[in-house]
């Protein structure tokens, strides 16, 4: 087993904004990752998932508008879903690239959870756009539920 270890962190912008763009992006990324494996590195791969969480959350919210009895998934579940599908795509692309090179190594995806302080002051001034655009009325409803929203100029 390799003693050389490296953590690779993939940024969310590197995945594109559609499923097809993500598949193309992870195929390119898998080649670079496989190069590291070939060089006898043991990899741990992390990735950002903000845009993917947002896409899932928007889809769930829209589904709720069509099917009134549907209960939308909370943001934490949308985050887990995005970890799963992004990890799945990276895992499959890397496994395929390794097999193409005659390298037989296990590739696994692990979901994570993060504990945050709900009273952290950063929540009062959100800086990342996650979720859908909403009317002032919808924003007021979310605020009454205890969610943080931010007005985007424009």
Residue ranges: model-predicted function:
Residues 1-46, 55-65, 74:
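N-terminal glycine-/serine-/threonine-rich phosphate-binding loop
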Residues 8-10, 44-47, 103-112:
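General beta-strand structural signal in soluble alpha/beta enzymes
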Residues 14-16, 50-54, 115-119:
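Short, active-site-adjacent cap segments at secondary-structure transitions
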Residues 63-154:
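Ligand-binding beta-strand-loop-alpha-helix segment within the catalytic cores
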């Amino acid at each position: 087993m390799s003693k050389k270890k490296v953590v690779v962190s993939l940024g969310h912008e590197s995945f594109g904004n559609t499923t097809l763009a993500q598949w193309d992006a992870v195929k390119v990324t898998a080649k670079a990752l496989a190069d590291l494996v070939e060089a006898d590195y043991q990899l741990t791969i992390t990735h950002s998932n903000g845009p993917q969480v947002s896409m899932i959350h928007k889809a769930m919210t829209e589904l709720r508008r069509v099917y009134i009895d549907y209960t939308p998934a909370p943001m934490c579940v949308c985050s887990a879903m995005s970890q799963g599908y992004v990890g799945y795509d990276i895992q499959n692309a890397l496994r395929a690239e390794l097999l193409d090179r005659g390298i037989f190594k296990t590739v696994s995806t692990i979901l994570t959870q993060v504990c945050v302080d709900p009273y952290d002051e950063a929540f009062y001034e959100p800086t990342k756009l996650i979720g859908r655009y909403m009317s002032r009325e919808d924003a007021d409803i979310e605020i009454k539920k205890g969610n943080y929203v931010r007005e985007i100029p424009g």
